[in-house]
Amino acid sequence: MIIAQNKTNYQDLLKTLAVIAMTIDHIGLYLYPELTIMRIIGRIAMPVFCFFAGYNFYDKPKTRIIIYGVILQIYTTILFKQFLTTNILISIYLGQCYIYYFRNSITSFFYNGFCHVAVMIILWYISWTLIDYGTLVIAIMILGFIAQHEKTNLKLCCFIAIFTSIVHSTFFTLLIPLSDFNFSNTDLILNLTFLTITYILMILSDYSQKILINIKWISRNVIYIYCIQIIILQFIFIYKYTYGFKNW
C-alpha cells in the first residue's frame, strides 16, 4: 500500500512528532548537554523514522539520501576537524541498499525476515562506532519493510523496534558510561515510558487514516529539516564551546 500523496495522514502525524523529538534531542546534544530529559525525549525519533523508512521503501535506494548524507558528513568533518560517526542519512541509505538486495529473502517467509533483523542487531556491536546507531538502523528498517508486506505482523514489528531501542539506551548507560546516553535509573524509566507511548501511538490507528491538520510540509521534508538543523546547531556548538574560527 502506498500512502496517498496529497492527503495528510496518521503516518504524517507520527513522523511530525518524531521531528519535534529529534529537534529537542539535537538542541540538547549541542546546546544543553546537562538537560538529559531532552536526550530522553529524542530517543523516540530514531525508531519512528527508521521504521517508516523501511515501511515506505518499495523501489530502489534513493540517491539523494546518500548525497545529502555525504555532504553533511564532509561539513561535520571539516567543522570538527576530525572524522566522527557518520550521520543517520548514511545509515538509512545502507538500510535501503540492504533491503533492496535481500528483499525477496526478507519477505519470502515470515521467519526469514526476522533472521535478517537478528543478524543486524548482533552486528550492531561492531558497527556503532562507524555509523550512527550502527546496524540497528537497518534492523528497524527491515521490521518496517516486513510490516508493510505482512500487515498481521505490524504490532509485533513495532514492538521489536521499540524494544530494541530501549535495550540500546540501557546498554549504553550500563556498559559504556562515557556515551551520549549516560542516563540515570530515573532517566531510563522515563525513556521506557516515552518509548512505550510511542509504541502505543504506532499501533493505535491505520497509517493511511486522514487527519485534518496539514503537516505534510513537516513530515515529508524530514531530510531537509534534519540537514538544516544539524548544520546550524553544529556551527553554534563550535562557535560557542571551542576557539571558534580564529585559528583556521
Swiss-Prot record:
Membrane topology: Multi-pass membrane protein
Biological source species: Rickettsia prowazekii (strain Madrid E)
Record flagged with keyword Acetylation: no
Cellular localisation: Cell membrane
Alphabetic keyword roster: Cell membrane, Membrane, Transmembrane, Transmembrane helix
InterPro entries given in the database record: TraX (IPR008875)
Protein name listed in UniProt: Uncharacterized protein RP591
Spans through the membrane: 65-85, 105-125, 126-146, 156-176, 188-208, 222-242
Any Gene Ontology CC annotation: plasma membrane
